[in-house]
UniProtKB/Swiss-Prot annotation:
Family assignment from sequence similarity: Belongs to the PSRC1 family.
The record's account of how the chain is modified after translation: Phosphorylated during mitosis.
Tagged with keyword Cell cycle: yes
Sequence repeats: 38-41, 68-71, 103-106, 194-197, 212-215
Expression triggers: Induced by adriamycin and mitomycin C, in a p53-dependent manner, in NIH3T3 cells. This induction is inhibited by actinomycin D. Also induced by cisplatin in a p73-dependent manner in embryonic cells.
Compartments, as annotated in UniProt: Cytoplasm; Cytoplasm, Cytoskeleton, Spindle; Cytoplasm, Cytoskeleton, Spindle pole
Described purpose of this protein according to its UniProt entry: Required for normal progression through mitosis. Required for normal congress of chromosomes at the metaphase plate, and for normal rate of chromosomal segregation during anaphase. Plays a role in the regulation of mitotic spindle dynamics. Increases the rate of turnover of microtubules on metaphase spindles, and contributes to the generation of normal tension across sister kinetochores. Recruits KIF2A and ANKRD53 to the mitotic spindle and spindle poles. May participate in p53/TP53-regulated growth suppression.
Coiled-coil region list: 70-94
Name of the protein in question: Proline/serine-rich coiled-coil protein 1
UniProt feature, compositional bias: Low complexity: 222-231, 300-316
InterPro entries linked: DDA3/GTSE-1, GTSE1_N
Signal peptide residues on this chain, from the entry's feature table: none
Amino acid sequence: MEDLKEDIKFIVDETLDFGGLSPSDSHEEEDITVLVSPEKPLRRGLAHRSNPNEVAPALQGVRFSLGPLSPEKLEEILDEANRLAAQLEECALKDRERAGTGPGRPSPRGKPSPRRETFVLKDSPVRDLLPTVSSWSTPPPSSLAGLRSSDKKGSARAVRVASGKKPSSIKKESPTCNLFPASKSPGRSPLAQPILPPRRKTGFGARTTASPPIPVRPVPQSSASNSQCSSRLQGAAVKSSSRLPVPSAIPKPATRVPLIGRSLPPGKGALAPDSLSTQKGHPSAIGHRASVSQKTNLPTTSAARGRTTSAARGRAQPLRKAAVPGPTR
């Protein structure tokens, strides 16, 4: 230790001589050394300088010196401060670790607690232990299945009732629909149906008979207009039969039959005018009477047919407006 103390030298004064020719600094130092000499007492107002390189005298007994600390003491204080700082750092680290590894908090390196994990309680037995608050608002699946089955049964019954009521409605409308034969399958388009000759009905409850040929043959225009009218009425009837039947919109044949048969009796509609003249017993005037009857019957039959066509068109127009044809399947 003594060798180390001898090697260490402290710089007490640092003299900076900027002017080499001016000995002002040296004179001041000489004066200071003279003042510090132990022979003379210290003057007040002057700085007291101590030489750190001097060895402190041995302590005689218990004696406290209030002077500056020796370098040995300074080194010991520095070592002690370093040790204390290291201990404080270690204690702070330990406190942090203890605070992090508490009973309620999980350790950062360990497995997390199961409280933070989420579980699906759909099929677990713990579901029965949970409170059933929403059980009255949402019915159980068994009741839902029962409701669905009851709904299915009710819909099946409604379909059966509707299917059972359909034939009765068709039968009710059959007296008016028998005038024009409707298609068996209502899904077919009315254009694809073949045009059949119309039927005539003498009474409301009588059976249907095939319509006889037109009595007046030499007039082709009236027959063409009658066929067009019958085809239009038949198409309208097919459209109405394919959809829900409208009893008020279908024209009844009772008004058309007496108009056509005004000149001829209903029982003798199929007989020609020649046969009528022969039954009366005038063989000499057959041709004349036939021509007269033809001439007389022409305007009546044509007027009657014109009336029937106009009436049928007037009645068929609201039917076309009421029953809108759907898209062809």
